[in-house]
Amino acid sequence: MEILPIPAESFKVGFIGAGKMAESIARGVVASGVLPPNRICTAVHSNLNRRDVFESFGVNVFSTSEEVVKESDVVIFSVKPQVVKKAVTELKSKLSKNKILVSVAAGIKLNDLQEWSGQDRFIRVMPNTPAAVGEAASVMSLGTGATEEDGAIVAMLFGAVGKILKADEKMFDAVTGLSGSGPAYIFLAIEALADGGVAAGLPRELALSLASQTVLGAATMVSKTGKHPGVLKDDVTSPGGTTIAGVHELEKGSFRATLMNAVVAAAKRSRELSQS
């Protein structure tokens, strides 16, 4: 059967699962003007609070997932990994080649998604929690039946909550170790920087504000200047100055090696979980 292109000017998006990630994506899509809220839907079975949340910014909320699939051209499975198989198989008879299917469930491979759904027009996306503030680092991989045009539509949707890049699915465990788990590493770093500020005599509130803004500013410099972070580091480390003294302490504590080890360990754990 011929795959029909999704109408770019009128397509509708439906979320299976009405949790925080679905909310973040939906809010981003609406706020950025990618889609009006009346072209987005989800289903809430019993949690009235989640219904109120989605309805508060104009999203259509149905009572069943079957209604979501029926009304949508792009169906995004935004449920926990342990229940995604059940969610997909229960809707199998409603899915077709005329719909783009998307999963954001960590560790669930395209082969499994395609087998459970009976469809190969699937796209796997790995977002991360900063999607909640429009600063996600997402990676996507296309299934065997998904077209480049399908990928462009999904990139447009997830681009509304941050940056989205394309990669081979075999890289997803490493992606999990870096961008998936990475926010936690940075939260820890911000907390440690703030604690250092307190130890040096700063009030807690001031220390935390300076720490978080410093990390944000440094990340923005890397992103916007295109300079290698090592070059930016060299630019701020004067001979015999304060910054190189601090960098020296980080090097003595194996700061870089510890971060590298954290990424590798998380990637290894992701690989183990996906094989279990």
From Swiss-Prot:
Keyword Translocase: no
Source organism, top-level taxon: Eukaryota
Top EC class for this record: oxidoreductase
GO molecular function: pyrroline-5-carboxylate reductase activity
One GO CC annotation: plant-type cell wall
Lipoprotein as UniProt keyword: no
Residues forming coiled coils: none
GO biological process: L-proline biosynthetic process; response to heat; response to salt stress
Swiss-Prot/TrEMBL keywords: Amino-acid biosynthesis, Cytoplasm, NADP, Oxidoreductase, Proline biosynthesis
Reactions catalysed: L-proline + NADP(+) = (S)-1-pyrroline-5-carboxylate + NADPH + 2 H(+); L-proline + NAD(+) = (S)-1-pyrroline-5-carboxylate + NADH + 2 H(+)
Pathway: Amino-acid biosynthesis; L-proline biosynthesis; L-proline from L-glutamate 5-semialdehyde: step 1/1
Broad class of the protein's primary localization: cytoplasm
Pfam families per record: F420_oxidored, P5CR_dimer
Compartment(s) where it occurs, according to its Swiss-Prot or TrEMBL record: Cytoplasm
Enzyme Commission numbers on file: 1.5.1.2
Similarity field: Belongs to the pyrroline-5-carboxylate reductase family.
Protein name as catalogued: Pyrroline-5-carboxylate reductase
Organism: Arabidopsis thaliana (Mouse-ear cress)
